[in-house]
Structure formats: structure tokens, C-alpha cells
Regions:
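A conserved beta-turn-beta hairpin within the catalytic core of GNAT-like acetyltransferases
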Residues: 79-90, 97, 116-120
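A short helix-loop-beta-strand connector motif used in the catalytic cores of GNAT acetyltransferases and
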Residues: 46-63
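Conserved acyl-CoA
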Residues: 104-121
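A short, internal acetyl-CoA/4′-phosphopantetheine-binding micro-motif in the GNAT/acyltransferase core
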Residues: 64, 90-98, 126-127
Length: 169
């Protein structure tokens, strides 16, 4: 990776952002990386319409990572309470996973949470069965709170329960 530049997503970014997220989370392309959900979930991760709504929401930001003109990653940060921010949709181009970009996106998200929302804590959720991903976040200072949340699908899939992790910023 040469010069990685981070910036907030804007509405015109949806056309490039949506396929990146789908490539990283679902289907055969996701299997080029180690953080995919392709073996657990078979539908789409998000939609272009949902992304446009997230980008337009003043209570959240999606940070993009570019290497030159190429979109290579993103992460979402949202205000979740008085001093709490929520981290979600951390995405790295599958062929670039394990390059350190995820860590850089996480650092940028934490910095943005403090600067934009005045957060002193960051919360996130990870599917309980993703032990290797939970371990990755634990190495970066996130700890399980003991709280769990249902995975938002109908009909419910209890085996996909979320574990809540939190870190002081």
C-alpha cells in the first residue's frame, strides 16, 4: 500500500462503496480474505439505498480508505449515546486483508469518534461464532461486555448471536 488517504464518504461514493462491502463480506470473492461471513450468510450485506441513508445521517460517518484512486476499505462510526460511539462495517478489500489496513481503519474510526462525537468509549458487535475476529479486536483493546444481541434476520438465527465489545478511547 502506498499513500492511503482517509476521508468521509459522500453520496456519490455509493457506487464504489457498495460492491466493495459485498466483495469483502459475502460470496466467493470474500473468501480471499479471512474476515468474511460467506460461510454463515448468503444474502447481501447491505444495499445501495441503505448506504446512501447512512451517508446522509448526521449522527454517523463512513470513513473511506483510498490508495490513489482505488477504494480499498471503509468503516462506519455512529453516535450511540452521551459519550459512546458505535463501530461497524469495517471493510478491507479481500486481497489486501492482513496488510495492516484494518488496524489503520480502526485507528481512524476511534480518532473520528472522539473528534466528531466526543466519544469516550467505542462499542461494536461481532457474531459470536467469529472467534478469530473477536480475538483480533481483543488484541486492539476491545473487551466483551457480557451483553449479547440477536442477529437482525427473520426468521431468527440464534447461532448468529452478536457479542458486544467495548473499548475506552
Amino acid at each position: 500500500l502506498s499513500e492511503v488517504v482517509f476521508r468521509a464518504a459522500m453520496s456519490f461514493d455509493v457506487a464504489a462503496l457498495h460492491p466493495l462491502i459485498e466483495r469483502a463480506y459475502r460470496g466467493e470473492t470474500a473468501k480471499a480474505g479471512w474476515t468474511h461471513e460467506a460461510d454463515l450468510l448468503f444474502d447481501t450485506r447491505t444495499s445501495a439505498e441503505e448506504l446512501a441513508g447512512l451517508i446522509a445521517d448526521p449522527e454517523r460517518v463512513i470513513l473511506l480508505a483510498h490508495d490513489g484512486d482505488i477504494l480499498i476499505g471503509c468503516v462506519q462510526v455512529a453516535r450511540a449515546g452521551q459519550d459512546l460511539a458505535y463501530l461497524g462495517m469495517l471493510t478491507v478489500e479481500p486481497t489486501l486483508q492482513a496488510s495492516g489496513l484494518g488496524r489503520r481503519l480502526l485507528d481512524a474510526a476511534e480518532t473520528e469518534a472522539v473528534a466528531r462525537f466526543g466519544a469516550r468509549r467505542m462499542e461494536m458487535t461481532v457474531i459470536r461464532r467469529r472467534a478469530e475476529l473477536i480475538a483480533w479486536y481483543r488484541r486492539r483493546g476491545y473487551a466483551p461486555t457480557g451483553e449479547t444481541r440477536p442477529f437482525p434476520v427473520d426468521p431468527p438465527r440464534p447461532e448468529l448471536e452478536f457479542v458486544v465489545l467495548e473499548k475506552a478511547l
